[in-house]
């Protein structure tokens, strides 16, 4: 049974917390210097920094491949939608297309990367229901790119600064 607050909880800031905070901060600073919105790259960092490398690959991969599949699928669905309503503005059709797209998303994720369903669905919904007609392709591609940057940076940090390596360095 779920118990709140947990009896076994102890407040501490560990190496993973520090790596996540510093990496997200650095990615945000670089993005701000490039005058790009750092939100999705930072989210990629947070998803990509797991307890160890296998956990990072799993969680970062879920975010990356989900975003990739959801973003590309959103482009295709939006393209179909615009064949019927070139100016947009008909959300009922988008709702119907979303239902079909979610089935396709789940099938693609089951085949390529099963953990990608949730992040892929989020990207799909955001693109379909909150992206202007003029920018849906660029928006989708930017989300894929930014997520990839965040996840890749997180994986590199976790690879080059695993807990064991840092502990060994400080014990010298």
Residue ranges and their predicted role:
Residues 1-124, 129-172:
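Alpha-helical transmembrane segments and their membrane-interface boundaries
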